[in-house]
Design a protein with these regions (language model features):
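Catalytic core of soluble alpha/beta enzymes
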Residues: 148, 153-289, 296-297, 303-315
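N-terminal capping/lid subdomain adjacent to the active-site entrance of alpha/beta enzymes
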Residues: 1-171, 178-185, 189-193, 306-326
Length: 326
């Protein structure tokens, strides 16, 4: 087995701002696995920045286990030598792609998804000026679900602008840990009246227990507070939805396991992304078959996408082509 690791940078159309800061481009690693017969599998990862992951740290992790991987690896042994995170995600997704190519079997079938459906993704509007948020909302007025990034100071005004421009859309609000429970309770009634259907990770990871005091009616989704199945116990009874992201789980293998266990516990599932290219969205679409909410809009945020990229029609995602992945 040959392992190749490449670093790439994908500029955004406009700088993308969330409560933690802004970025002009997304840096990713792409792992390519090639077997002795020339079959190739690819996987992309951006890593988890709030866990301190960088391109350099992910590449270092992979170089440390290169000899083991080049001797041959499967999903179980991969999970034993790499922790959850971007490095394992890239290899795990490349391995799914490789096995699909080796067996000439669609990845959906390998994952136990008999009849994959096209998914409807939300589109994300970053933190910006009133004019920019309003313009963005008008651009996506026909999309059924709009996600609005907010922070501790800018919240209701942005949601009002989106509602005015998109009267029929559902709205997801994402503070990225920027609120506390008191602010959440103050905002919740108007958020409900504005048609907000979900609030993602309102409070910081580690302060989840404060949500025992939440009095609102809008559902809450755990994002930064849950990486993989080990985090489910922390959020039960506090959140109603779990945001599954492959960079957090360490790949599609654990993402599927997390989604299935969350559903068994009575939680709904959201499948999100780290704003990658279509190569990262494709395995996300497999996990998305188990989700009530889908946020796989990464390619639309970039100035350009990969060859054979996933096509979007007002949020409706085309199933990925095998030439891309799977």
């Amino acid at each position: 087995m040959k392992l190749r690791v490449d670093a790439e940078s994908w500029p955004y159309k406009v700088p993308f701002r969330v409560s933690r800061g802004a970025e002009a481009a997304l840096d990713v690693i792409v792992v390519t696995l090639e077997d002795s017969s020339g079959h190739i599998g690819r996987g992309e990862a951006a890593g988890v920045d709030y866990h301190g992951e960088t391109i350099a740290s992910m590449k270092a992790q992979l170089e440390a286990v290169r000899p083991r991987m080049e001797c041959g690896i499967d999903f179980e042994s991969l999970a034993a030598i790499l922790p959850p995170g971007g490095a394992r995600n890239a290899v795990d997704c490349a391995l799914w792609d490789l096995i699909a190519k080796q067996r000439r079997t669609p990845v959906w079938e390998l994952a136990g998804v008999a009849n994959p459906r096209r998914l409807t993704s939300s589109i994300t509007l970053g933190i910006d000026t009133d004019a920019a948020v309003a313009a963005g909302a008008r651009r996506y007025a026909e999309w059924p679900l709009i996600k609005v990034k907010v922070d501790g100071k800018r919240h209701l005004d942005a949601v009002r602008l989106v509602r005015a421009a998109c009267p029929a859309a559902g709205i997801i609000v994402d503070p990225n840990q920027a609120w506390d429970c008191d602010l959440l309770n103050r905002l919740a009634p108007e958020l409900k009246s504005l048609g907000v259907v979900l609030i993602e990770q309102p409070v910081p990871h580690g302060e989840d227990a404060t949500l025992h005091g939440y009095t609102g009616e809008v559902r809450l989704a755990a994002d930064e507070s849950v990486d993989d199945r080990a985090g489910l116990a922390t959020v039960q009874g506090l959140y109603q939805v779990v945001n599954v992201k492959l960079d957090k789980t360490g790949g599609l293998t654990e993402a599927l396991a997390l989604a299935r266990e969350a559903r068994a516990l009575g939680l709904q599932v959201m499948v999100g992304c780290m704003a990658g290219t279509s190569l990262a969205m494709a395995p996300g679409m497999v996990a998305g078959q188990l989700a009530e909410f889908v946020d796989l809009d990464g390619p639309l945020l970039h100035a350009e996408d990969r060859e054979h990229g996933i096509q979007y029609d007002r949020g409706l995602m085309q199933l990925p082509l095998p030439a891309l992945w799977g």
